[in-house]
A protein has these predicted regions:
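Mixed-charge interfacial surface used for oligomerization/domain docking
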Residues: 2-5, 11-25, 30-32, 92-95, ...
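A glycine-rich beta-strand to alpha-helix segment
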Residues: 87, 116-117
Length: 287
């Protein structure tokens, strides 16, 4: 059996050290702020980045193009390895299509290689949780094909439960409609968002006040997890660590004390959510 590598986009929003320790190659998206373009997770610190957003600075993101995708994948094929790429949701970006185009071109140049690109229909640490599960399967000795089959069967079981301070950033980035954005700007109303079966963000409710919105995404996670054993729950935040830690404690209390990984949301996805976002990701009932 040929050796294979698992690659991801930077939108997994996992700590760089975590990815490095596990030898996971990462293809970064980019963001531009104040006329400067940076790779995701590079340039500004999370605190610096979100402070700029709070001050009204705009951050614009760009997707991966096929040439960049090819440059990342080809070295592994030259080494005689097969490749599985877990791509950022096609419902939020054209990155998946760029990865797919590059893979099709590379398949002609490397006919003996297996190159699989999967549209995860996930984002942020939802992608990260999927990667966590995939690495477990690889450690268990599963083949490339077995892992790809598992991902396709289970990717819609990655639940995304999100609350934001307001929806203006998501609207500006084209991730939600103007109507939804207006809905979320009511005084003290905090939107509740999830990822649907098409990998798109949908506003599904509202709560009055921050604490209620944080409790709501935990309650959603508890309901989704019925019948599922979660050894790992992931939580991301937009420069609001106290809120993330509050959510983590409630998750541990209600879900049997799973391991919880907390990390800042990345600069690319954070460009669209804005500061103050908190999200919980876990395996659960199908979206």
């Amino acid at each position: 059996m040929r050796e294979f590598v698992i690659t991801v986009n930077s939108t997994v929003d996992l700590p760089k050290e975590w990815l490095k320790e596990r030898n996971v190659p990462v293809l970064p998206l980019k963001y531009t702020i104040d006329g400067q373009t940076y790779q995701d997770m590079e340039g500004l610190s999370a605190k610096e980045f979100f402070q700029k957003l709070r001050e009204g600075h705009m951050s614009v993101t760009s997707q991966i193009n096929p040439e960049e995708a090819r440059e990342m994948m080809e070295p592994f094929l030259k080494e005689g390895k097969d490749l599985l790429h877990l791509a950022f949701s096609s419902g939020l970006s054209e990155t998946y299509n760029s990865m797919r185009i590059a893979a099709e071109e590379l398949a002609e140049d490397y006919p003996d290689a297996k190159i699989i690109v999967i549209d995860t229909l996930c984002a942020c640490m939802g992608e990260g949780l999927l990667l966590y599960k995939v690495l477990q399967l690889k450690d268990q000795g599963k083949t490339l094909e077995e892992i790809a089959e598992w991902v396709e069967a289970n990717k819609l079981h990655i639940c995304h439960n999100v609350t934001v301070d307001d929806l203006n950033h998501l609207h500006r980035g084209g991730r939600i409609s103007k109507t939804a954005a207006v809905f979320g700007t009511l005084v003290q109303v905090k939107p509740i968002i999830h990822m649907d079966e098409n990998g798109k963000l949908q506003v599904i409710g509202k709560e009055r006040g921050r604490k209620r919105s944080l409790n709501k995404i935990v309650d959603m996670a508890v309901e989704q997890s019925e019948g599922w054993e979660n050894d790992m729950v992931m939580i991301t935040h937009g420069d609001c660590i106290e809120d993330a830690e509050y959510v983590a404690e409630r998750v541990k209390e209600k879900l049997g004390n799973p391991e919880v990984l907390i990390n800042n949301i990345g600069t690319v996805i954070g460009s669209h959510t804005g500061p103050g976002v908190v999200a919980v990701f876990l395996m659960g009932n199908k979206r």
